[in-house]
Amino acid sequence: MNVSNNSNMDHNDLAKRGESLIRKSTNRYLTTVRIAFRAKQRRFDDFDGLLEESAIKPVQRSIIELSDEQDQPDLLPG
């Protein structure tokens, strides 16, 4: 999935990723809070100029990132 271009983003894929995060979690509330916290971090990173300008919204980006982390834990450092 191309994260940098909003026109290429498949909203059905985004919905499936969000549902997958909720379904695989043990606590739906904490998962929702993690998504919101990650989105808030991305939003402030965008304001600080730490991230390149992106057409994708912070909540959408956080769902994609958390879904990728959940589905591919071997890609995480550490």
UniProtKB/Swiss-Prot annotation:
First-level EC class: transferase
Catalytic activity, EC: 2.7.7.6
An example molecular function term from Gene Ontology annotations: DNA binding
GO biological process, one term: DNA-templated transcription
Signal sequence coordinates: none
One GO location term (cellular component): DNA-directed RNA polymerase complex
Catalysed reactions listed for this entry: RNA(n) + a ribonucleoside 5'-triphosphate = RNA(n+1) + diphosphate
UniProt keywords, alphabetically: DNA-directed RNA polymerase, Nucleotidyltransferase, Transcription, Transferase
Stated family: Belongs to the RNA polymerase subunit omega family.
Function: Promotes RNA polymerase assembly. Latches the N- and C-terminal regions of the beta' subunit thereby facilitating its interaction with the beta and alpha subunits.
Subunit description: In cyanobacteria the RNAP catalytic core is composed of 2 alpha, 1 beta, 1 beta', 1 gamma and 1 omega subunit. When a sigma factor is associated with the core the holoenzyme is formed, which can initiate transcription.
Protein name in UniProt: DNA-directed RNA polymerase subunit omega
Organism: Prochlorococcus marinus subsp. pastoris (strain CCMP1986 / NIES-2087 / MED4)
